[in-house]
């Protein structure tokens, strides 16, 4: 039976339609909602010429009939208010007075808007909107469902009661039971003698019990009084008052505490407090107690906006009981758009701040909770701005910055050299494709970008060395302050096709200095003007590799890519040119195909070098994924490089070491990487790196690594008065992995060993215990640093849907175990998951 009625109780009519075993009722709330067809809205005007607005979608004219428009996805419309929503009733049978008292019997339901009421039988009074539910009562409202033996409530859920309810909250996957439920408003539900958990009834590992729990859907939070936390049915904590979010939205309040043990600080406990200032701003206050040092206060402030974003962090320990002094740290990172588009572009001006500093040399070692943080010895304080010029000057980018350093000396008398401060640096860069690539109407390239490319850059820097606050108390050069101007220019003409490429290039660099030595008797700083010419070229050959299809299980392609790179730079004596920001570039596959063996602006290597290389690739024919890559390269120097970092090279060599690198991805997710550097004059490898990993499925990984470095003999010189014999300086092994021991327990570990010192470098042993609503992690870690061993014991209990308690071993596991994957969190519920 379908029942149409007006909420006011007049002008009602009844339309009977026989339906087997069920009667369906529909209650109209306003006379205007009775089936009155409305003509479609007028079509928008057509686009004017030159307009960028999208063309309208034309809907065929069907006269006075509303036409449904096809759509490619289900859309959630604007919700209808309760006073305008229709009321539906469904049951096996219905009797009573239509406008006064209705009795729905057998699988009864009442639906209105986002409210669904179900029971075996429902007595419903439309005038008062009150329903009495008898047998298997159920109320679904928004993201919550309540079930009990019987209930009395208003259908709009503004008031009512339910006995012995069981409830579920979809967004947080929470559930619980209570002695009684009282519905105070449409959004506030109060439970007496209630429980709360995110566990399933089959695995009730933890739950909260409370005298009273109040769920507020408007504020999207749950509040409770006299709460007791139960773990494996054992009370572990009493909470007089607690508040938890019922959605993913942020909320101010106490976060779970962080606890652990460290051999330097003793027992370490932090109680975070989160402040949700605004949707784009928040603050976390971090009071921290260390049994061997005292109480530290820390904090983190975050902000984000279309034109700016920033993070400010800091810690302050008023009196370190172990060190006998105040300790502090700050870290400020800021991005700011002053003008134009925040993403950059012509006319945009963007600024930034990266500033960090600590109170003393040992602060990172004493207080950092990560390996990377504990070995940090240098902090930057950098402020700058960059802008792309507008209009016809848009090929130019200008910038300015100041940069100072705090260099720590944690291992005195061994010292760390401090770099020069830059106060300030002003740069201007120009780059233009004189003949840009052409493209079709679809935006795809018709011709590759093969036109000439020109570039020009200028750099003015003022270097300063703060001798008074640095150890050692002499500058790394003979100058304590200097001005340097660098001008670079280049013109290149790349030609590229699918089978080959040629890239000729000419460039120059000019350096000029205005510097005074801090001691008399030294020659003034020497500048230079040095040109360079280079030619980079390569070929590409490819064929089907049917013979490898059986090994890899699919069609494969084999390619060979020979490459030749020649560079010529005349020799210019730079023995009297100072060093401010320059060092050796190192030696690897990327460095061997480069113009300069130095990084920075104070040295230009003399070149008459030809580098030859060959790369072979095995790729999947269907996807292009690389399964194996092998590279061989060697450089020949026809005259021998004479320019060195700290002076001229006395006996330059004509041939470089031979480089070999290979990377293989076998079936079964086994990967192997090998790198070797072979010295042809000494007939031995001077550097070897081998790594391998097996990751058959997520959460399973085994890793192996080996590294060996051998240094050839170094003769004494004016810049190195001691010299050194040939020796192996590195010979290290490491093993790591993650593997499940059972369905619920996984083991994580790492072992690093140095065969030269016969010492264990680092050890990690960790266990993860995972259930549907509970994750427990524990880790034991030892790290050998500067002949001192630091021991950590970390533990963490993650109550899913509630929070995390304990120190965070996940970061430690990610850092030590390549491929480590923490236990995945449950998927966020879909808006249709509990669709009624």
Task: Give the positions of each predicted feature.
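Short, linear, compositionally biased motifs with a strong N-terminal bias
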Residues: 15, 29-30
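Initiator methionine at the very start of the polypeptide chain
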Residues: 1, 37-38
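Intrinsically disordered, low-complexity segments enriched in proline/serine/threonine
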Residues: 8, 20-22, 42-47, 58, ...
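N-terminal signal peptide c-region/cleavage motif recognized by signal peptidases
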Residues: 32-34
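Outer-membrane beta-barrel proteins and related beta-barrel translocases across Gram-negative bacteria
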Residues: 138, 144-160, 168-196, 201-209, ...
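Bacterial N-terminal signal peptides that target proteins for export
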Residues: 3-24
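N-terminal amphipathic/hydrophobic interface segments
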Residues: 38-192, 207-226, 260, 285, ...
